[in-house]
């Protein structure tokens, strides 16, 4: 209750109830007993969490955010508390807080502001990002974020959220999720931020590459506004 509003608590309890009723039948349908599931979890623990595990390096090297130029690469997004942290101490402090939280109390990590950066979809139940928070991100040199987490079925897209430019680059990879979403074939995507000043989005879920060229967009917009001023009518 110290971490979550009542509305969020009810949402989480509903999710738990749904999982309790559906998990074991889903495992049986996949031919898995609870012993199989337990064995898989223990193997994952051995590979990823044990000091000599094959993939132990993954969590040691993991960074929550990567700031380059005016872009911030992040899993989902930001709230006001993280905007405060970034303006005050920068992305190194963000990553340091994340690493510390990973080895602390799991509940604090998952439901606190740090984990909001990997959970938020800017819903009413998510931590708030206000216009002042966006202003602080701008003060930190962040004018656009490149992220995943939002479920997209037709490739990358650009959105303006809370006054912050979002390049949404999620791709559904695993076959089970693709089947549930009605997607065919294998899932793959790449977003190219090119040094020449354009962004290219390529996805198996869209038949063409998507290109964002700021200079070209600005030229077209300026031309449209000039045409509108001369005619006195909106140029649609």
Segments predicted by a language model, with ranges:
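Feature recognizes metal-dependent phosphohydrolase scaffolds
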Residues: 1-236
């Amino acid at each position: 209750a110290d971490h979550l509003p009542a509305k969020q608590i009810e949402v989480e309890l509903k999710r738990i109830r749904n999982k309790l009723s559906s998990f074991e039948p889903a495992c049986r349908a996949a031919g898995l007993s609870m012993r199989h599931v337990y064995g898989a979890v223990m193997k994952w623990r051995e590979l990823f969490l044990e000091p000599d595990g094959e993939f132990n390096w993954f969590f040691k090297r993991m960074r929550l955010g990567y700031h380059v130029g005016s872009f911030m690469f992040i899993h989902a997004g930001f709230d006001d508390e993280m905007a405060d942290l970034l303006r005050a101490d920068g992305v190194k402090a963000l990553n340091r807080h994340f690493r510390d939280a990973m080895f602390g109390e799991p509940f604090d990590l998952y439901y606190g502001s740090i984990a909001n950066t990997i959970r938020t979809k800017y819903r009413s139940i998510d931590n708030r990002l206000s216009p002042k928070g966006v202003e602080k991100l701008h003060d930190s040199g962040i004018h656009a974020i490149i992220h995943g987490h939002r479920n997209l079925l037709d490739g990358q897209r650009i959105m303006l959220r809370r006054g912050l430019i979002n390049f949404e680059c999620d791709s559904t990879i695993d076959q089970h999720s693709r089947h549930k979403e009605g997607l065919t074939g294998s899932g793959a995507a790449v977003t190219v931020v090119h040094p020449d000043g354009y962004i290219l989005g390529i996805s198996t879920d869209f038949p063409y590459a998507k290109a964002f060229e700021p200079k070209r967009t600005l030229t077209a917009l300026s031309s449209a506004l000039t045409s509108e001023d001369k005619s006195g009518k909106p140029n649609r």
